[in-house]
Every structure is written in structure tokens, then in C-alpha cells.
């Protein structure tokens, strides 16, 4: 069973980063840094597939094995892959420090082999009042992505 994973984020533009995952008890600690962003919040999600053959679009929808509506990371009703937002400072750097109890590095909620995506816009956490909000949080375009792999 994997206890650590890593993801290198890359896209067509300047956005890039490295994200690390570590299983700690019943949670996964997600840490790292993303550069090249515009200042403010950006949706941050695990997507269904580890397929980046057509850029980030081939990663599919948010990882959602429980067939729930989109929500925030603290919500009961959420996709497994819904990790909310990362916030970039005025220099375009987002420091990631998330503890999540729904994603896993093993079992049916395993994110290993799936794609991590950082989005153009803020995730409205399913509270946007339209159908797209309940699917994607209106986070819009995928700026950078990478497949999550087992790490030492």
C-alpha cells in the first residue's frame, strides 16, 4: 500500500508545480507549490482519469466514485476529488497545505493514477446556483495538470 505520492503539474502556459501526498492515519496531507498563476483563488481537483494525451481535457470529470454533486472539501455532499481552492499571492505562487479525509492513496477512493488539475477560476464549492456549479464549481479552464504517481 502506497503511503506517499507525487504529481508534477504542467500546462500549455506558465503554470507549473509539484504536489505531494502523504497518508497519515485516516487522512491524506496534500502539500506543495504552484507558480505562474494569477492572484486569487483557483479550483483544485482530482479528476477521474490519468490520461493527459490531449492535455488536461482528457483527464475527464472530477473523481466521483460515489456519484455525488460537486461541493467544498468540508461538505458532506461532494466529489471525492473536490479539494476546493488554492490561493495564489501577488507573485502568482500558491502554497498548498490541505488535509483531506475523503481522498486516499489506496482502496476505492485511491487517487493514484488519476490527474490533479489546477483551474483558471475559483471553485464556487457547488454554491453558484446553476447546473455547472453542481458539476465543476464553475472553475472553468484547466491551467495545468499531472498524473498522481506513487513516491518513495
Curated annotation (Swiss-Prot):
The record's listing under SUPFAM superfamilies reads:
Cu,Zn superoxide dismutase-like (SSF49329)
Organism superkingdom: Eukaryota
Q: Which Gene3D superfamilies match?
A: Superoxide dismutase, copper/zinc binding domain (2.60.40.200)
Q: Which reaction does it catalyse?
A: 2 superoxide + 2 H(+) = H2O2 + O2
Q: Binding residues for Cu cation, per the UniProt record? A: 45, 47, 62, 119
Its cofactor is: Cu cation; Zn(2+)
In short, the EC number is 1.15.1.1
The cysteines covalently paired via disulfide bonds are 56-145
Name of the molecule in the record: Superoxide dismutase [Cu-Zn]
Q: Which InterPro entries match?
A: SOD-like_Cu/Zn_dom_sf, SOD_Cu/Zn_/chaperone, SOD_Cu/Zn_BS, SOD_Cu_Zn_dom
Gene behind this chain? SOD1
